[in-house]
């Protein structure tokens, strides 16, 4: 991880393939090969995306024989994004939003 943990998380989330990997992992663990099979890109490209997600602390990996199994590190994502939101949004706005009372933006 870098000296800017939030920065590494946002950089990792900036890529749509990495966001899709996280969404694919939301229901549970997947092997690297299972993840790669879901995308029309090369295995080495998926490996690089997984490496970036791992470096940002957004996925965990474990070995199962010769397979590498990945899962979402949801608490890391929640803490980082929650910390960022609380730093840039007024507390009252966050409280209203959590209660479902946030004003809806006007659509023109």
Predicted features along the sequence, with ranges:
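Amphipathic alpha-helical dimerization/coiled-coil segments
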Residues: 1-5, 74-108
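N-terminal helix-turn-helix DNA-binding core of bacterial DNA-binding proteins
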Residues: 4-44, 66-77
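Positively charged, low-complexity intrinsically disordered regions
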Residues: 20, 49, 64, 68, ...
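Residue-level detector of secondary-structure transition/capping positions
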Residues: 29-30, 54, 85
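Alpha-helical residues within the helix-turn-helix
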Residues: 37, 48, 54-55
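Beta-hairpin "wing" of winged helix-turn-helix
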Residues: 54-64, 71
């Amino acid at each position: 991880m870098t000296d800017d943990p939030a920065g590494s998380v946002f950089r990792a989330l900036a890529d749509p393939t990495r966001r899709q990997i996280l969404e694919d992992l939301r229901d549970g663990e997947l092997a690297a090969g299972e993840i790669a099979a879901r995308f029309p890109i090369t295995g080495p490209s998926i490996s690089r995306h997984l490496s970036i997600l791992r470096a940002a602390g957004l996925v965990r990996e474990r070995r199962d024989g010769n397979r590498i199994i990945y899962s979402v590190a949801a608490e890391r994502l929640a803490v980082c994004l929650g910390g960022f939101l609380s730093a840039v949004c007024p507390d009252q706005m966050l409280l209203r939003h959590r209660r479902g009372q946030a004003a809806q933006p006007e659509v023109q």
